[in-house]
Amino acid sequence: EMKRVEPSFGVSDFLQGARGAYEMIVMGYERCDLAEIQPFLADDVYESFVDGVAAREDQGLTIEANFIGVREMELNDAKMDETTKEAELTIRFVGELTSEVRNREGEIVEGSSTEIKRQKDTWVFARVMGSDDPNWLLVSTDG
């Protein structure tokens, strides 16, 4: 259906872009650098990220994280609204990263810079097919 509305659409190209977006968005959130990732987030997702970052800052927590890579990635669902032409693709990611949380005193309170943790996320990306804007927005995150 999506290809009918937008013949140039390809799932493998989308997945390649989604993989890059996943790393950029996860690391933007971990590093509290939301300005860089805001253009890729739906407003409500952005607001929830802002709240999460603010909560960390209120507690005096800082995170030092390194992205190792995407271990698994699966297209779980794809649907398109015939009327609005808005497509939604649901992707399940398994990412690996190291993450160290420190308190105001600089003590590690969670994680480790050497221990690789697996993070599972199910994200929904949306876009109006056939529109001039090629970017997909992250409209839902569900660990």
Regions found by a protein language model. Give the residues of each.
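Core segments of small alpha/beta cavity-forming domains
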Residues: 1-74
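Short secondary-structure boundary micro-motifs
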Residues: 10-12, 61, 85, 107-112
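Residues in flexible loops and secondary-structure boundaries
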Residues: 10, 48, 57, 76-83, ...
